[in-house]
Amino acid sequence: ETGKPISGVKFELFDKNKESIGTYITDSNGEIHLDKMFLGDATYYIEETENEGYIVTKGLQTVKTKWGKITYVELENKPIQGKVQIHKTAADNNAITGHLKGDGLKDARFTVYDSDGEKVTVLRTDSKGFAESDWLRYGKYTMKETTSPLYFLLSDETISFEIKKDGEIVEIERENKSTTLQTHVEKSGYQETMGGSVIRYDLYHIQNKSLVPLENFYLHESLPADAAYITRLFTGTFNQNLNYTIYYKTNKTGSFKVLRDNLFTNKVYEIDCTKGLMAGEYITDIKYEFGTVDVGFCEVERPFIYCKTYQNLPNGYQFTNRVEVGGMYEMQKVKAEDSFTTKIYAPVVSRGKLPKTGY
């Protein structure tokens, strides 16, 4: 096929009576030299017996020698070639895509490497989950999944296979587990308070519980603008080294503005939320934006906020503040929410019975 010499090929030599004379092996140039062994005109036979990686030439080849002349015999071998076929299926039911367990998965990509670690080809599964290579030469190969089907987990397995026989197709079956997208957050605070009081809310179990990293990960705390406002924030710390930004929104604005940026997740910041505002303007919403967080992201020291309720809230009035944590994976949004309701109590002042006056 290439014209290159093949070393290590074994031949058996026979005399005219087809009695074995010996076994000979080609050198690095693909040649066997038999000097001064054969004199005169004669007939010999050679048979190729072993040729790793190539299709062995079958049958006896006739060689006729002549006195005083060099006889050349040249043989060509076709390489052993085969293919690899991968079938990728769902390991479980996928709530996002609707795939059922056993369904074929499209767009899984596999990179095939030879025994020296050199890239040979890239395979991509079709709508039924199948991908098949072109012809591969005899030898050992490995294959790695480099892109998983959408909303399925990428496998870290190195798949080994070998082409041994000409024309064979090595069939491989593999599964992908579904991507689980889940976040979590909880909050706690005062169940009752008085109007004009300062109260504290804690945020905890802030987690990326997905099996994949999430982009645009955020934490959003919101108070009802007619009941309370945020006065002070303690940021907490988190278990992954990231820089993040905190935004705020007030009772006077409908959009978020930067409160503090270039914050470090391993440091607690105390932030005064009353400075730089107009008269009668108060912060009602705080939003952390972390960018991309890895699997298992969570707080180490819990964040908490101090809030002040408005003075004139009536007895029995209830207000609910909410927290939301979320992110995105491959354009799929995920979020979790929690809330906490606080009730206002106001002491009832008993005036007593006024005495009668007059005549």
Where are these regions (language model features)?
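Solvent-exposed loop/turn and edge beta-strand elements of beta-rich ligand-binding domains
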Residues: 1-359
